[in-house]
From Swiss-Prot:
Gene source species: Arabidopsis thaliana (Mouse-ear cress)
Protein name in the entry: F-box protein At3g57580
CDD domains xref list: F-box_AtFBW1-like
F-box domain span: 4-53
InterPro entries: F-box-assoc_dom_typ3 (IPR013187), F-box-assoc_interact_dom (IPR017451), F-box-like_dom_sf (IPR036047), F-box_dom (IPR001810)
SUPFAM superfamilies on file: F-box domain
């Protein structure tokens, strides 16, 4: 038999199973090799299968901000599913430069929202897919400079929405246009250092109001925004007022489908420094019933001596803490509240520059990241954001809202 003429035809189901185990970037490359593969790998059935397989291997997503270089870099690593894992390797995905403003980003279902990125002398709101680097710009709105905005996902209509103060923009609705929402609510100011959290189609974020007199003249409240109905509710959060001077200590998390608030502090335990973690869980959102848990983490010299933040809570219930700045070695910590165990995993691969003290970057980490091919195929996202620094004024139309393509 002439092996050069040998033609082996694989069943379509087998092709789907093989490719569903690959990274999304590899799938994108194989789509270009033949019309048959492109048809299979762009089908709705394969997109659903890929998402199902990807959900079984969640990752940690890292967005690293380098102030000195005006640059964001995006990495991901396997999320620990084995108590005996000691290290994990990063995969670099994309980056963008161009006078990055020191504003915190917002994350929702695989996309990142940046409220102020300077591109070609223009301040632009940018939504970016950190894996592919594809992005789009949104119309700029007149608002309070302290406002930061959020990106949220509507699980009912399967659409993303951008939300800033009382303005809402729906992606996938044709023209990208902000709508103003009149809200009968107390005068409040969002805590700009807090990213908020979206849980089952409801956005929660921390804010301050002056309605109730306190020793500081302010009190905390939590704003609750239903993404589908676009209705607001307000949750009394005065129990956190002793953190008013430093709200950065508080993190909102998705704790097993319920709103959680965490606060970490180093304490002296028998002459040794250790970390105390407080967790409040909103057990009943209608009755506003909170349950508080206090954990003293197992002794860990690295954790007790470094700056860290709470990245979130995994679907399996592990509370993930990560070092706040890149360095070598860099660690992520998994605390299991039920077993009272603390797992330390070294994250390798930020690169020599980011690991230098003088060039370190601030790390924003997100748990349970899952690759979704439908995000990679979104026509509204344009060319790679890594190229924005090279845009000249005559190419500025690439990021202007009126020139954004049709929406899927």
């Amino acid at each position: 038999m002439d092996r050069g003429k040998m033609n082996v035809s694989l069943p379509t189901d087998l092709i789907r199973e093989i490719f569903a185990r690959l990274p999304s970037k590899s799938v994108a490359r194989f789509r270009t090799l033949s019309k048959q593969w492109a048809s299979i790998l762009r089908s709705t059935d394969f997109t659903k299968l890929f998402l199902s397989r990807s959900s079984n291997r969640p990752r940690l997503l890292f967005a690293v901000e380098r102030y000195k270089c005006n640059e964001w870099q995006f990495f991901s690593s396997p999320q620990s599913q084995n108590r005996y894992e000691k290290s994990a390797h990063l995969e670099f995905h994309s980056k963008f430069s161009g006078d990055v403003s020191h504003y915190i980003c917002s994350y929702a279902s695989g996309l990142l929202y940046f409220p102020a990125v300077h591109i070609v002398d223009t301040e632009t709101i940018v939504i970016c897919n950190p894996i592919t680097g594809m992005y789009t710009g949104l119309p700029v709105i007149m608002k309070d400079r302290r406002s930061r905005g959020f990106l949220v996902f509507d699980p009912v209509d399967k659409r993303f929405k951008a939300f800033d103060t009382h303005f809402i923009l729906t992606l996938g609705s044709g023209e990208l246009k902000w709508r103003e929402k009149n809200i009968p609510c107390p005068l409040y100011e969002r805590c700009s250092s807090n990213q908020g959290i979206c849980i089952n189609g409801v956005l929660y974020y921390l804010a301050k109001t002056v309605l109730v007199e306190t020793v500081f003249g302010l009190t905390f409240l939590i704003v609750r925004f239903d993404v589908s109905s676009e209705e607001f509710k307000f949750i009394d959060a005065a129990r956190f007022n002793d953190r008013l001077k430093d709200p950065t200590r508080l993190s909102l998390v998705n704790y097993m489908g319920k709103l959680g608030v965490t606060d970490c502090n180093c304490v002296d335990a028998g002459g040794r420094r250790t970390v105390e973690l407080c967790l409040w869980v909103l057990e009943d959102v209608e009755k506003l019933e909170w349950v508080k848990y206090v954990y003293t983490l197992p002794e860990n010299e690295v954790l007790a001596s470094c700056e860290f933040s709470v990245a979130g809570v995994t679907a399996t219930g592990d509370i993930v803490l990560c070092m706040k700045y890149t360095c070598k070695p860099y660690y992520v910590f998994y605390f299991n509240p039920e077993k009272k165990t603390l797992q330390t995993v070294e994250i390798q691969g930020f690169g020599a520059k980011l690991e230098e003290v003088e060039n370190r970057g601030e790390v924003f980490a997100y748990v349970d990241y899952v690759e979704d091919l439908s995000l990679n195929d979104a026509k509204q996202l344009k060319s790679s954001i890594s190229h924005v620094k090279s845009l000249c004024p005559c190419c500025q139309k690439l990021v202007q809202p009126e020139n954004i393509g049709e929406v899927v």
